[in-house]
Amino acid sequence: MNPNQKIITIGVVNTTLSTIALLIGVGNLVFNTVIHEKIGNHQTVIHPTITTPAVPNCSDTIITYNNTVINNITTTIITEAERLFKPPLPLCPFRGFFPFHKDNAIRLGENKDVIVTREPYVSCDNDNCWSFALAQGALLGTKHSNGTIKDRTPYRSLIRFPIGTAPVLGNYKEICIAWSSSSCFDGKEWMHVCMTGNDNDASAQIIYAGRMTDSIKSWRKDILRTQESECQCIGGTCVVAVTDGPAANSADHRVYWIREGRIVKYENVPKTKIQHLEECSCYVDIDVYCICRDNWKGSNRPWMRINNETILETGYVCSKFHSDTPRPADPSTVSCDSPSNINGGPGVKGFGFKAGNDVWLGRTVSTSGRSGFEIIKVTDGWINSPNHAKSVTQTLVSNNDWSGYSGSFIVKTKGCFQPCFYVELIRGRPNKNDDVSWTSNSIVTFCGLDNEPGSGNWPDGSNIGFMPK
């Protein structure tokens, strides 16, 4: 082979090898691209980087490997459903009341484990209903329970425990120091109003979401006191009735509007109609209705209708079937704008529910003492009418058994508030037949349904002879 042929042969071989190297590089690139598109999340992909020499120089093909990590991170944020303030709903329809819970606290106190209480009530949050009571700082039948008939001592405190359970060591929570109280849930947080101190210089502490946020100081210097049952909240504003002044003479009565634990305003209850007002039992039926106790002049009960801004109406329940204790025999006078001036004092805490022109009234069976309990429906009993008639009577505690205070509470359901009430069943002093040194209570509760109820008797049921003295 002559020199020219050798040069031509070397050139052809060089060109052929360069072409092959170029094709290999292109093939690697295509293969790499296809594999990369098929790789899933969170996998390590190895991409070869190809360095191809210039076509005239076919000596080597250099392949360098780089590791690339591909991570797709998804963050899921779970948030609690936003709590809303309670809206102004109507009362649910109802035709009667049905037994709900009974704590049997005195019967269970035979072994001295139960806390001495009085002035119990019930209030509910979004999830549960709770029993509240004013504890005496003593256990049933212990030496410290001697003399617990007293209403106001520095040892009394507001406690909370699950509805239907007795207040025993381990199941209750102390809310505040108090010998008078009211509590309500605004849809987001609990608010408590707690009165304590000297009779002539007491104060009310307002607790919201577990923190002390505001206060009320006694202005009449005569036993500042409040409802002894739940207050009511609409749209975040809670309404509380407060009294200061004599128990059997002209006193001062105020309504406070409180938002998130801070007092927004208060108004004096006009005395044009209401002569005396204390221990109101309030519920929501679009507006707030309060049925209260006249401890001075009336065996008929004073009432108020209130919204988020002002007192809208006041008066006395018209019904000629009165519901305070003591009271005259049925029927009595119709008095819508003033107290009856018959068996006016002292009185007992009670409740009622307006139902159109009708009214449901809870009352002791006895007209003179705190024994028995019944709820009656009085047709046209909310208005001044000659047609008042007892259309329903449910006797829930027989007249042979002790009762006491009673009050309303409401339970939020779909689109309305269910009307409910509790009855305090007092045992011990001052009952002469209860030969013990203490005064305490159990509680029974009922709720309204749009059905016909049955009948029964739900007394305290404890045998005082079995109880610690």
Curated annotation (Swiss-Prot):
GO cellular component, one term: membrane
Gene3D superfamilies linked: 2.120.10.10
Chain intervals for the UniProt region annotation (Head of neuraminidase): 91-469
Residues bearing glycans: 57, 66, 72, 146, 308
Localization per Swiss-Prot or TrEMBL: Virion membrane; Host apical cell membrane
Domain of life: Viruses
Transmembrane intervals: 7-29
Sequence segments annotated as region (Hypervariable stalk region): 36-88
Catalytic function, reaction form: Hydrolysis of alpha-(2->3)-, alpha-(2->6)-, alpha-(2->8)- glycosidic linkages of terminal sialic acid residues in oligosaccharides, glycoproteins, glycolipids, colominic acid and synthetic substrates
Function summary: Catalyzes the removal of terminal sialic acid residues from viral and cellular glycoconjugates. Cleaves off the terminal sialic acids on the glycosylated HA during virus budding to facilitate virus release. Additionally helps virus spread through the circulation by further removing sialic acids from the cell surface. These cleavages prevent self-aggregation and ensure the efficient spread of the progeny virus from cell to cell. Otherwise, infection would be limited to one round of replication.
Name recorded for this polypeptide: Neuraminidase
Upper taxonomic lineage: Viruses, Riboviria, Orthornavirae, Negarnaviricota, Polyploviricotina
